[in-house]
Design a protein with these regions (language model features):
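ABC ATPase "signature
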Residues: 167-168
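Hydrophobic anchor residue at the start of the ABC signature
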Residues: 96-97, 124
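Conserved ABC ATPase signature
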Residues: 82-86, 90
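A short, surface-exposed alpha-helical micro-motif characterized by mixed small hydrophobic
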Residues: 149-151
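Catalytic Walker B motif of ABC-type/P-loop ATPase nucleotide-binding domains
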Residues: 107-110
Length: 201
């Protein structure tokens, strides 16, 4: 990151600086939060990490309210609650509220919509795209869903057994694939106008 091997990062101050700049959203929201920390604490930690530890309490509440509002949550309904009291979709939105407060340079989004229903999925994706537009962050979106990759990406990298086998713009890679691996990946996407062969299922 910035020309440095992240494995060499040592000390609390360096780690805090790294995690302020690089954050993640993961596919399982239920394992992404400390079950003993209330939502207020989760959001306050983000403000503190951004250097807002000494802000007045009213200002901190204003920032947390703004972050929750960005993801269509009401802070006053979340205060004194624990993350596990929320639905999966709400927890995923809470993770995005964290990112809104932290404003990292890079966001690693690992299958962030795989465990939520289709309606919530579209909402979460739109929130991520709006957040990218508002903050200018780079989002590295990891997914097995080729249609989703096309929807959210400027550039696409196809990997096979841990190695990059093809990369380019979303249009180049998905609409005009060059390698066997990419062609196979795209051909495996079910098409509603084709008869499916279920004999191998």
């Amino acid at each position: 990151f910035h020309g440095r091997d992240i494995a060499t990062i040592r000390g609390k101050a360096e780690r805090c600086e790294y995690y302020r700049r690089v954050q993640g959203i993961f596919q399982d929201p239920f394992s992404s939060f400390n079950v003993f920390s209330k939502i207020d604490t989760v959001l306050l930690d983000c403000i503190n990490m951004r250097g807002g530890r000494h802000l007045p309490r009213d200002k901190k509440i204003e920032l947390m309210t703004e972050a929750c509002s960005f993801v269509n949550l009401k802070f006053e309904e979340l205060t004194n609650k624990y993350p596990f009291e929320l639905s999966g979709g709400q927890m995923q939105r809470l993770m995005i509220a964290r990112i809104f407060l932290l404003k990292p340079k890079v966001l690693l989004a690992d299958e962030p919509t795989s465990m939520i229903d289709a309606c919530s999925r579209a909402t979460i994706l739109d929130m991520l795209m709006n957040l990218r537009k508002e903050t200018g962050m780079t989002i590295i979106f990891i997914t097995h869903d080729i249609g989703l990759a096309y929807y959210v990406s400027d550039s696409v990298y196809i990997m096979e057994q841990g190695k990059i086998v093809e990369y380019g713009s979303a249009d180049e890679v998905i609409l005009n694939p060059k390698t066997y691996n990419t062609k196979r990946l795209i051909s495996d996407v079910p098409k509603i106008y084709e008869v499916w062969d279920l004999s191998t299922v």
